[in-house]
Amino acid sequence: MMHAQADKKPDEKLDSRQQIIEAAAQCFMLKGLEKATIDDIADVLGSTKGRVYHHFRSKNAIYFAVHRQAMQFCFDAVGPVLELSIPYSEKLEAMAVAHARVMMDTLPYQRSIRLGVEIYLRGSTTEAERAVLTELINQRNDYEELYRDVLNAGVAEGSLCVPSVKIAGRVMMGALNGLVDWYRVRPEQSDADRDLIATDLARTIVGGMTA
């Protein structure tokens, strides 16, 4: 008789893996990367550690998966904006709105990876894990490059004016990512409330960059 695990369909295995990633994001957000344990993740799932270890060999591996998913949320949110045929100042603001919304909508992921790469770089990691960390840093840099490209295009177009695109990009990402440090989910908060927060933040940032 085959084990039940062997009978699982590919999509069921994917769902199980995704559930672990989501539970880990919650644990990392609440307890921090260094204090959260596999036991904590299993508790959130209401399962045993065995289920977690079936998909991930270590807590580091889970963190890497959380980080990849967090960044994918960002790419998915901003991608459609990049296709819009609008002035680059408007595009930059729309990108900022999309980023701010994804920070709020996927808060456990985004807060759990805040400075996470730097924490792991300071810690004890294997050569293979350091290679993954480099990959994650490159992924983050690729995302930030999307904003620098729009900033450069906006300056060339004349709709944006900044002394340094490099510094403007860092200031912008710092302000947007910093949202996870002060934003708190409230039961009475509506989707429109989140839109307003995202729009106000984006306009505050980009407003100082328009020509």
Show which residues each predicted segment covers.
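C-terminal peripheral helix-coil segments that are non-catalytic and often amphipathic
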Residues: M1-D7, A98-V102, N141-A156, M173-A211
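Helix-turn-helix
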Residues: M2, K8, Q19, A23, ...
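Alpha-helical structural segments
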Residues: D15-Q26, L30, V44, A61-L84, ...
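Amphipathic alpha-helical packing segments from all-alpha helical-bundle domains
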Residues: Q72-F75, G123-A156, I167-R170, L196
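Secondary-structure edge/capping motif, primarily at the C-terminal ends of alpha-helices
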Residues: V81, S85, V117-S124, Y183-P187
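Short acidic/histidine-centered micro-motifs embedded in hydrophobic/aromatic stretches
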Residues: M95-A98, L115-I119, V171, A175
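Amphipathic alpha-helical segments used for helix-helix packing
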Residues: D105-A131
